[in-house]
Amino acid sequence: MIKMNKRFYNFQNQKIELGANEVHIWNFDLDKISSLMNEFENILSDDELVRANKFHFEIDKVRFICSRGLLRLLLSIYTGISSRGINFTFNEYGKPSLIEAQNNFELHFNLSHSKNFMSVGFTKNALIGVDVELMKPLKNH
């Protein structure tokens, strides 16, 4: 079990094996780890930092930085590549994947977030899709 706490470096330098027939799903409340934003900023790419600074609302910027930082940390523990060294390629819809040179593991991942909630799924040798939506109460008529 990997614990996420205020010392996020406890989370780094770990290794998790993903079996060929396994699916790993990670769920996070981004607001509960927003205090780690400065540490996450240090592992983001320049492009990710530019994108983060385009958000109008600070809470959206913080959530973006935390979600990308978490994605990089998770990819690092599956691949052994440093969090900062992870490089992405994007499909025509903007979905990220590891560049081919870094993906000798046939690792596939997908992430989704809604407000403060983020979910990331990982598989080997198969595509994966995850989707989360926060439920909104129905109005009484």
Regions found by a protein language model. Give the residues of each.
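Core catalytic alpha/beta fold that binds nucleotide/phospho-ligands
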Residues: 1-141
